[in-house]
Regions:
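Helix-loop-helix junctions within the multi-pass membrane cores of secondary transporters/permeases
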Residues: 2-99
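Transmembrane alpha-helical segments and their short flanking loops
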Residues: 11-33, 84-180
Length: 180
C-alpha cells in the first residue's frame, strides 16, 4: 500500500523528469517517500526496532523476550515481520496505539527539522534495508546532522513505546488459551 501511495509519482522517466524540473525551478519537495525511512520507520513501520529495544529492556514476559531476541537481527535491517506477527503487534490493542502514534510524532519531528533547515532534505534513494542511522546519513547526502535528528526521533519513539511494553507485562500470556 505504501508503495502505491508514496512512490507512483516518482517512477519512470516521467516522474524523474518532473522531480528534476521541480529542482530546477527551486520547488523541490522538502519531504519525500525516503524521508519516512530516514526519520520515522526505524526497523520498519511503527518504529519497531525501538519496540524491540524496549522489550529487551523492560519486558518481563518470556514470550515477548524470546520474540524480541529473535527479531533483533532482522529489525536492524528494517525487516519487522518477526516482531509484527510473532509478538503480535498485528491485532494487539495494546500495541496498536504506539504503532500508530510513534511514527506520527517522529515524522513531525523529522519534518520540522527539515523545514527549519536543521537537516538537509532527503535527496538520495537508499535501500530500505540499510540500518536506520546510516540510512538517514546517506539519504540526506551525507549530512552529519541527519543521524542526530534520527536519534532524537528514535528516543521519542522509545518513550512512546515503553509504557505500552510495561503495560503488556501485566497481561497474562495464557489468556485466551483453553485448557485441554
Amino acid at each position: 500500500i505504501n508503495i502505491d501511495i508514496f512512490q507512483k509519482g516518482y517512477e519512470g522517466k516521467t516522474g524523474t523528469a518532473a522531480v528534476l524540473a521541480a529542482i530546477d525551478d527551486g520547488k523541490a519537495y522538502m519531504w519525500v517517500r525516503g524521508s519516512f525511512d530516514a526519520f520515522a520507520w526505524f526497523g520498519g513501520s511503527g518504529g519497531t526496532i525501538v519496540l524491540i529495544i524496549a522489550i529487551l529492556l523492560f519486558s518481563k514476559r518470556a514470550d515477548y523476550l524470546t520474540v524480541g531476541k529473535l527479531s533483533l537481527g532482522p529489525g536492524i535491517f528494517n525487516i519487522n515481520e518477526p516482531i509484527m506477527f510473532g509478538l503480535p503487534v498485528v491485532l494487539n490493542p495494546i500495541m496498536f496505539i504506539p504503532f500508530v502514534i510513534a511514527p506520527l510524532v517522529a515524522t513531525t519531528i523529522g519534518w520540522v527539522a527539515t523545514y527549519l533547515g536543521l537537516v538537509a532534505p532527503v535527496s538520495q534513494q537508499v535501500a530500505w534495508v540499510t540500518p536506520p542511522l546510516l540510512l538517514s546519513f546517506l539519504a540526506t547526502g551525507a549530512d552529519w546532522r541527519a543521524p542526530i535528528v534520527a536519534l532524537v526521533c528514535m528516543v521519542v519513539t522509545f518513550l512512546i513505546w515503553t509504557p505500552f511494553v510495561i503495560a503488556a507485562n501485566k497481561m497474562d500470556p495464557a489468556l485466551g488459551e483453553s485448557e485441554q
